[in-house]
Amino acid sequence: DCLGIAGHPDVKTPYLDSLAAEGTYFPNAYSACPSCIPARAALFTGLSQEHHHRVGYQDGITWDYPHMLPAALSDGGYHTEMVGKMHVHPPLYRCGFQNMTLHDGYIGYYRNPNAPAKEHQLFHDSYLHWLKCRCGYDADVNDAGLECNSFLVKPWPYDEMSHPTNWTVSESIRFL
């Protein structure tokens, strides 16, 4: 309902409108849950929130589901890759994806210096490693004004192509 093609009077979404006009548009679609992690669990497992028991992010709660869509696709011969954020535990749990290029930043637990090394963001966050190589070791997303589920904002201090959204798009195109 927040798309130009849906008739919203103020929101301008020309690129999404173009994709919808040229492809398939689902005007009655809805998310099983409007929060990213429970919605991801619903998409991956086919279970409702009542049955997958995710209400949001919780540190250290494993994703222990017997069946997940990425695994079924991989088993069916599809080449699967996850690009972007997963926010699952443990951090490098594949959920059935064959390859993962992650940006799982923002969450305090994984930035805690006392977290086990394999769970620390510097170990598993592909984007953070890339950003530090591109913009210098001191480059940091959280200090740049981006925080998980926050309304706080600051101007992005790096070049536009270094932004997590552009990195995710570039990595997705590289995969395709």
Language-model regions, residue ranges each:
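Formylglycine-dependent sulfatase
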Residues: 1-176
